[in-house]
Curated annotation (Swiss-Prot):
Methyltransferase involved in phenylpropanoid polyamine conjugate biosynthesis. In vivo, methylates only one of the 5-hydroxyferuloyl moieties of N1,N5,N10-tri-(hydroxyferuloyl)-spermidine, while is able in vitro to convert all three 5-hydroxyferuloyl residues to the corresponding sinapoyl moieties and to methylate caffeoyl CoA and tricaffeoyl spermidine. It comes from Arabidopsis thaliana (Mouse-ear cress). Keywords: Lignin biosynthesis, Metal-binding, Methyltransferase, S-adenosyl-L-methionine, Transferase. Belongs to the class I-like SAM-binding methyltransferase superfamily. Cation-dependent O-methyltransferase family. CCoAMT subfamily. This is Tapetum-specific methyltransferase 1. One of its GO terms (molecular function) is tricaffeoyl spermidine:S-adenosyl-L-methionine O-methyltransferase activity. S-adenosyl-L-methionine binds at residues 52, 74, 76-77, 82, 100, 129, 152.
Length: 233
């Protein structure tokens, strides 16, 4: 493999994956989200796989509504498909603090968020995730209802520690890509070299989460693996 990302999704049946997308996902995709998805593919090609798939987006939207989230965090934005999803799901006075080092990717998504009239909900911080989270912790104290993490997998343990100080008791922290294209069950020599560091980091992260008494967890086999952590203490 030449550094390309595999198609996102751990379902091995392409026919079943296509059925899910065509029957329940694409028909429910917001038109402007569809336009953003297509614009991301056009600009980034294979790297567009870094965005969340449509079925996962629908799940996140419903989750945010079920827990009545109003104040949320997103760590890792890319072109903002998941950010846009959450912004649409939040009430009019909802707020998202989004952190990413890449202003250009965010700007691509921002034009679609403006068309939808949800850009006022977003506070974008151009920063790497570590410094951005430290900035939030050192700034005005706020409680967050929900956090979505799709950033450097080698820092997931660090992100967990920081977010447990920011997300309220009973709030949800969602970590994306926790099954990492299905490579966690492969032998190391079967995994493309450019994917091994994240594979090792996620193997360790999943073990840590499994025994962490501060959170209740559920790992969901949607997209590339999504782990929900509900803060208990």
């Amino acid at each position: 493999m030449d550094g390309r990302l595999p198609d996102k999704g751990i379902l091995k049946s392409e026919a079943l994956k296509q059925y899910i997308m065509e029957t329940t996902a694409y028909p429910r995709e917001h038109e402007l989200l569809k336009e953003l998805r297509e614009a991301t593919i056009q600009r980034y090609g294979n790297l567009s796989e870094m965005g969340v798939p449509v079925d996962e987006s629908l799940f996140l939207s419903m989750l945010v509504k079920i827990i009545n989230a109003k104040n949320t965090i997103e760590i890792g934005v890319f072109t903002g498909y998941s950010l846009f999803t959450v912004a649409l799901a939040l009430p009019e006075d909802g707020r998202i603090t989004a952190i990413d080092i890449d202003q250009a990717g965010y700007n691509l998504g921002l034009e679609f968020m403006k068309k939808a009239g949800v850009d006022h909900k977003i506070n974008f911080i151009q920063s790497d995730a570590v410094r951005g989270l430290d900035q939030l912790l050192n700034g005005e104290k706020q409680e967050y209802d929900f956090a979505f993490v799709d950033a450097d997998k080698t820092n997931y343990v660090y992100f967990l520690e920081k977010l447990l100080k920011l997300v309220k008791v009973g709030g949800i922290i969602a970590f994306d890509n926790t099954l990492w294209f299905g490579t966690l069950i492969q032998k190391e020599n079967e995994v493309p070299g450019h994917m091994r560091a994240y594979r090792e980091a996620l193997l360790e992260f999943n073990k840590i989460l499994a025994r962490d008494p501060r959170v209740e967890i559920a790992q969901i086999s949607i997209g590339d693996g999504l782990t929900l952590c509900r803060r208990l203490i």
